[in-house]
Design a protein with these regions (language model features):
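Membrane-interfacial loop-to-helix junctions in multi-pass inner-membrane proteins
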Residues: 456-460
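Aromatic-residue-lined binding/catalytic grooves and analogous aromatic/hydrophobic interfacial grooves
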Residues: 1-429, 435, 444-448, 461, ...
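Aromatic-lined, polymer-binding surfaces characteristic
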Residues: 474-496
Length: 496
């Protein structure tokens, strides 16, 4: 029988970093488990700011031989200055990942509710200021089933919520038991509409900045007392809540895409949606386990207390098992067949301009995301990376020709939603490193070694040969008979 691995806590999350993650590859959610105000921070993998731009520096090909000669003569400072001017892309930055929206559940427990003005943008807030006295509090993420649960007693009333992100139905689903509540959709910027769709459905829509994708989140509730006033959805003491999302990256008609998913989920009903989700998720998690035979009694400690205890040097084999399972859970949550690959934050992001833009940092971070894919029996979770290599390849061919006068294709240390392969930033230890495509192509070989899927290898072999062709054209034969790549770097290392 498979062990039920859980992360659990005896208090709500006060900030985004200690909320608990759900994911179905395309959508992500961070659940806070609030007592009066439940915040669920939502992401959609294709919600990015801006469209594709050809950023190749028009002077790159002209000055590349000069940079190489300066490096050969050990005139490093001069080479760096010229590279910054001639090889840096114009502009120097790719596009960045964004937030989808917040789903907010505000319980109406007889006290004067906080005004809606305070709900406009919860990003970055200390959520503990919204909490109220409760007893018996517990929030838990069941990694084995992929379900988040929170329970507590408030004003002598038992409150229970559970939620998950479904792969089969492609929706976020929640079951609520507690006080009557109002349900809100909010986003801090780039919002065009927050509208009533019908008496049990609301939507939020907009565009992720100038040239960015158009996005939509649509939320529907089922249960007694459900109604909409303005753009606020009201639910009774017991209700099922579903949320679907779509962007123009995949769909021409976002409203129709969201409605279709909501109609299917509500027609099937919460019990069936949950059963399908749990069956699919458990099958993934059951493929690989790590047994270190920890002390079962330690499972009764909240996870944050176990981590503190472990940090003090106390053994906890069960915690190591738990985090092994959690690592597999996270990859399955942010990378599924047909989705975009895991980005710098997997899929979970609470910022309109996240650290390093939340892109794909391909001078080790993206590779690290997928190092566990094959060996931990998550082989199909690797596929989004190969799909993205296919998106990158034509842009990488343009960069190879435009910057280097070379055949094949090249990528530098970052790429984005559109597969941009031109250099990113003006940071000498990383920007001019040209081995991103070649390194990522090693993952094609790794996938083949584990699957022996000859059709897959045939379909992707040209990506590998194209990455090799670039170096056949650009590798420089030194006087000692060795080949070198110039300019390049050991990623993010500097001269001392």
């Amino acid at each position: 029988m498979m062990k039920q691995y859980q992360l659990w806590y005896d208090a709500p999350a006060k900030d985004w970093n200690i909320a608990l993650p759900l994911g179905n590859g395309r959508m992500g959610a961070m659940v806070f488990g609030g007592t009066v105000l439940e915040r669920i921070s939502l992401n959609e993998d294709s919600c990015w700011y801006g469209g594709f731009r050809d950023r190749v520096n028009p002077d790159a090909k002209k000055y590349l031989p000069v940079v190489r000669q300066l490096l050969k003569e050990d005139r490093i400072a001069e080479a760096q200055q010229l590279a910054e001017e001639a090889l840096t892309a114009t502009p120097d930055g790719e596009r960045h990942y964004e937030v989808l929206c917040d789903l907010i559940l505000q319980q109406l427990d007889g006290e004067t509710p906080e005004g809606l003005h305070g709900m406009r943008n919860l990003r970055g807030q200390d959520m503990s200021r919204h909490e109220r006295p409760v007893s018996g509090y517990r929030r838990a993420l069941d990694i084995t089933d992929g379900v988040h649960q929170v329970s507590y007693v408030r004003k002598e009333k038992q409150i229970r919520r559970e939620c998950f992100l479904s792969v089969p139905h492609q929706v976020f689903a929640m079951h609520h038991e507690g006080f009557s509540s109002r349900v809100l959709l909010r986003r801090g910027a780039y919002v065009n509409r927050i509208d009533k769709v019908d008496e049990h459905t609301i939507l939020l829509s907009g565009q992720a900045g100038d040239g960015g994708v158009q996005y939509m989140a649509m939320c529907r509730a089922v249960g007694e007392g459900v109604h909409v006033i303005g753009n606020t959805l009201h639910i009774g003491e017991t209700a099922d809540i579903y949320l679907a999302s779509a962007t123009s990256y995949r769909f021409a008609d976002l409203r129709a895409a969201c409605l279709s998913r909501l109609e299917t989920a509500t027609a099937d009903g919460y019990a069936a949606v949950k059963a399908a989700h749990v069956a699919e998720h458990r099958a993934v998690m059951a493929r690989c386990t790590l047994a270190l035979h920890g002390e079962d009694a330690l499972d009764n400690l909240p996870t944050d207390q176990r981590l503190a205890r472990y940090a003090q040097g106390n053994a906890d084999n069960g915690l190591e098992e738990l985090y092994f399972a959690f690592g597999r859970y996270l990859l399955a949550g942010c990378s599924r067949p047909g989705t975009l690959p895991a980005n710098l934050q997997g899929i979970w992001n609470d910022d309109f301009h996240p650290a390093w833009d939340g892109k794909y940092t391909i001078n080790i971070n993206t590779e690290m995301n997928y190092w566990c894919a094959e060996v931990c029996n998550l082989s199909e979770m690797h596929l989004p990376l190969f799909d993205h290599l296919r998106r990158m390849q034509p842009h990488g061919a343009q960069v190879a020709l435009g910057m280097y006068g070379a055949n094949g294709w090249v990528a530098h240390h970052n790429t984005d939603l559109w597969g941009d392969c031109a250099p990113q930033d003006t940071y000498c230890p990383a920007t001019y490193w040209p081995m991103g495509a070649a390194w990522l192509c090693l993952h094609i070989a790794e996938h083949y070694r584990y699957t022996l899927d000859a059709d897959f290898l045939r379909a992707n072999y040209d990506l590998m040969t194209g990455a090799a062709d670039f170096f056949l054209d650009t590798a420089i034969l030194r006087e000692d008979g060795m080949y070198t790549v110039s300019p390049s770097s050991s990623p993010e290392n500097v001269y001392i």
